[in-house]
Amino acid sequence: MIEVIDGQRQLKACKRIVVKIGSSLLTANGQGLDLDAISHWAMQIADLHNAGHEIILVSSGAVAEGMVRMKLTSRPTDLPSLQACAAIGQMGLIHTWSSVLEKHTIQTAQVLLTHDDLADRRRYLNSCDALQNLIEWRVIPVINENDTVSTDEIRFGDNDTLAAMVAGQVHADLLIILTDQQGMFDSDPRSNPNAKLLTTVNAMDDALFEMAGGGGVLGRGGMVTKVRAARLAAKSGCPTLIASGESDHVLSRLMSGELLGTLFSTDKDRITAHQQWLAAHLQTAGRLVIDAGAVEAIKQRHRSLLPVGVKAVEGHFNRGDVVECVDQSGQRVAVGRVNFSSRSAEIIKGLASDKVHQVLGEARSLEMIHRNHMAIY
């Protein structure tokens, strides 16, 4: 009961909110954009906007709209066709959002991003500045992944993850992911009729992945992906709420303090802007496999990664590149800027600090990755 009350207070106190709306809530059973549904969303968004909330909208639906415009009955599987559908459908998607929000005297702006945009330091900072200006001007950014120029992101990426990255970028108070599911259950409700809806969970609880299920046809983000997104947002100190967009006036009810769906809470402090940029790297130049002692030192004691804790070096990278650190089961532990090239890292892996000096000389850094240049998962 205390957790529910705390969750209600937490929701009511949120000012800057990233709202992600999935394809199934914006399309008419996959038959293109549903103008009535989008108009209804616009009304709720306008209510929050007029109440003083700062809304950043992450909207899916471009590929589904493109399919209808090209009279396709099934989602293409080849990359060029998917990219073409996204390009065609994005025209309709942004026009629809602009039109319905303009009726509420709200100005919108289209922002198309890829993971590469967020991984490049300069482009990341530029997009941060642009989003900040839009928010200050009381303009609602309508953000989507730039599927037309994406490569593997269009097959493996998703707007849940993009929304979590944006939440970190803009220092959001809350990420809301609206879907066709009620929230997070303790088991898959499609196979277990006795599955229970979880009201509040800790975003960093590893057990959540065991409870998550799959996704729908037009959308790409199943519950596993949403849990990962909630964890990514949590690293920036941002809680996530996953709720059913099919509930009446769900946004208005949530922001009035009604706790619907599942709140993924976080006890983590906000990480620095540099660490947020590091955390945005879903793809890295290489990776370091580290032992249990190094995992404990990084996650529990917030220490730097030393060569002695590195068991294996994978990929080709240069000094200053961003690499990921994984445990010996392959689970990502952290990402960070490495102080050695892959060639040097291979030479010094597993060596104690005094041995590193003997091999590479006194002038070189002792840390494989310094804690100030690391984002922990």
UniProtKB/Swiss-Prot annotation:
Substrate binds at S60, D147, N159. Keywords: Amino-acid biosynthesis, ATP-binding, Cytoplasm, Kinase, Nucleotide-binding, Proline biosynthesis, Transferase. Pathway: Amino-acid biosynthesis; L-proline biosynthesis; L-glutamate 5-semialdehyde from L-glutamate: step 1/2. One of its GO terms (cellular component) is cytosol. Pfam families: AA_kinase, PUA. GO terms for molecular function: ATP binding; glutamate 5-kinase activity; RNA binding. Residues 285-363 form the PUA domain. Its EC number is 2.7.2.11. HAMAP family: ProB (MF_00456). Catalyzes the transfer of a phosphate group to glutamate to form L-glutamate 5-phosphate. Belongs to the glutamate 5-kinase family. This is Glutamate 5-kinase. It comes from Acinetobacter baylyi (strain ATCC 33305 / BD413 / ADP1). The lineage of its organism: Bacteria, Pseudomonadati, Pseudomonadota, Gammaproteobacteria, Moraxellales.
